[in-house]
Amino acid sequence: MQAKIGPIRLSEGVSRFNAATYLYACIICIGILAGLNFIQPYILSVVLDIPRSEQGSVSGSLAFMQEIIAIISISLFGVLSDRIGRRPVMVFGTMVVALGFALFPYATTINELFIYRSIFAIGAAALSSVLAIIVNDYPTEQSRGKFVSLHSVLNALGVAIFAAFLGRLPTVFTNIG
């Protein structure tokens, strides 16, 4: 018997738990990927003491570098997920994103910031590729549109939640001293 989540029919071999875990990952992963951009101004201002007049250039360069890394590596992670499975690539991506996210606030120079953002970018490429693959793997053909829509809504919700939470952290840290 085919599993369902509400009106969404899942492909053979995909359990409701698999789908629920994936949908949770849509909120968390995309929220974290976007979340780095919400804490970056605080790190540039307070941790690295970069003048506001230079922060746009640094932020743009960091974003550009992350996109280049994504363009170069995302197809590699797609192929890798076909060869070794979605789970190992997703676990790798999650661990590497966590490492980059954890190191990012400890950067003492702009060069370190670029190194830590590169680490984050590699994990982000792995996560992004697997999330895009699974959204097509899990539903049946008849339910694909509904599942993609739910995936997109949860991505947006994740960004909003993390923006609200992480966007307040600089104020909290500043008030603490």
List where the protein language model places each region.
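Pair of pore-lining "gating" transmembrane helices in MFS-fold secondary transporters
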Residues: 9-46
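Central cavity-lining transmembrane alpha-helices of secondary-active solute carriers
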Residues: 60-78
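Helix-breaking motifs and short loop linkers at transmembrane-helix boundaries and internal kinks
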Residues: 85, 106-111
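Primarily marks hydrophobic transmembrane alpha-helices of the MFS/SLC 12-helix fold
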Residues: 87-90
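C-terminal ends and interior cores of transmembrane alpha-helices
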Residues: 95-108
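Paired small-residue
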Residues: 100, 111-119
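Core transmembrane helices of Major Facilitator Superfamily
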Residues: 119-131
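Glycine-rich segments within core transmembrane alpha-helices of 12-TM secondary carriers
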Residues: 148-171
